[in-house]
């Protein structure tokens, strides 16, 4: 793979790199400055010699433009020097994963979890309304704003694993559900359907969010320290719902049970 490491003050289009923010299997994210407007922004990069995830992410961000207060603004994309693809978007603040870890007891209050739940559900609904499923809902892909204007806004990030489930704006014309689908997502937060190789639907995004909210309130999930994927799946099937949801509000049990019964074609209410 081509090395696409960027240096401080390096130019990518009209954007100048300030520092690296994060790095993962698909590439890296940098804090940068728009030299035209002097605004802070984020640049995601990937090597040109790998299957592009930024192409999907750029497309989703463009589709969400003006349709969701929970999506970063798309600022540009392109290819540089034949070595890297890049995507530029607004810069957000700390991830919910970082905020959760920074708590002394690793717990958010009931009120905080409720506020986060509302915004996360809104963010997923906005995504679903344009015909896409996220497929990797987790605390690291959710963040708050970084300015006084948006520091209470939750943003949903990283659409590299997103998949179109409908080409119809009304979401009535669904793509056929596949069988034996490869695992997509993060083991800790994936729904049982994902472990079983089923096509992910809108309800699977929300089931992942349920696991996230439980972790926020309880500090951890029962399988947090389990490394074996099959054992995690077994624990998810075996644990009583009442035990899993004992630290969150009672209404979560009803919602979890309803989501667990849904199929790919079903629209969560």
Predicted regions mapped to residue ranges:
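Activation segment signature within eukaryotic-like protein kinase domains
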Residues: 116-117
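Conserved short submotifs of the Hanks-type protein kinase catalytic core
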Residues: 82-95
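Activation segment/activation loop of eukaryotic-type protein kinase catalytic domains
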Residues: 143-184
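AlphaC helix of the protein kinase catalytic domain
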Residues: 97-108
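Conserved N-lobe ATP-binding subsite of Hanks-type protein kinase domains
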Residues: 28
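Catalytic-loop of the protein kinase fold
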Residues: 128-146
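Short beta-strand micro-motifs within the conserved protein kinase catalytic domain, predominantly
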Residues: 73-85
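ATP-binding glycine-rich loop module of kinase domains
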Residues: 34-55
